[in-house]
Amino acid sequence: EESLRPLIDRIRTSLDHTAFTYEVVFVDDGSTDGSAAVLEELHASGSNIKVIQFRRNFGKAAAYTAGFAEADGNIIITMDADLQDDPAEIPALVAKLEEGFDLVSGWKQKRHDPLGKTVPSKFFNWVTGRVSGIDIHDFNCGLKAYRSDVTRDVKIYGELHRYIPVLANLEGYRVSEIPVQHHARQFGSTKYGWGRLFKGFLDLLTVMYLGRYMGRPLHLFGALGLVLGGLGLLINGYIATLWLRTG
């Protein structure tokens, strides 16, 4: 809750002097502190501030989905509310979109995170880049810019929010990145670590497997049918042999 007022102040400082018209959509993912009251206060302070409140914690993918559905703009920016992402980067993200890209991810420079987060995160990003073939360095950066077509077409659930660049690329959208500033966490603590890393790799395999066969379902089920059919023939042959031997 401590970061919410400074965050909206930084957003206003970064955007009020630009030609952009904008709104801010906060998604409260079932917070148990005083965030809900602060968000209601912020909502009352400006007509361009919207608030979505979940009754319990549904996770980041659900929060993104709700925020995307509520947003009215042609360009959507996502960022975490812990003040590690810098709203001053928004104009640069939008400028990169205007070069012809559909999704632009931030690439955090000089990260201010403990080794328990940066080491698994770097490993995760390296593996994801190699497996997906997408040449970006920071898939899990919360600071991203999207054309609204991307947020409308890419469906996420579970933990798939970290793979939005991969999913967008599979849909034919152009993905890029720019370096962004990263600030030290002032409030709260990180929950990222090796446990989430392992789960993330399982999700990556799911994304790539489905992406490979999404347009060719018969290739998947045809091959699966051949394997199962072959196993069935072997089992039936074994049973028939036993029956003949025992009479």
Model-predicted regions and their roles:
Residues 1-15:
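Short, well-formed alpha-helical segments that are part of the catalytic scaffolds
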Residues 2-5, 33-42:
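Acidic helix N-cap motif at the loop->helix transition within catalytic regions
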Residues 12, 20-31, 52-53:
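Short beta-strand/loop segment that forms part of the nucleotide-sugar
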Residues 15-20, 43-48:
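Short helix-capping segments at alpha-helix termini
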Residues 28-37, 83-84:
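A conserved acidic beta->alpha catalytic loop
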Residues 41, 48-70, 75, 84-170, ...:
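Acceptor/aglycone-binding surface of glycosyltransferases and processive sugar-polymer synthases
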Residues 163-247:
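Hydrophobic helical membrane-anchoring modules
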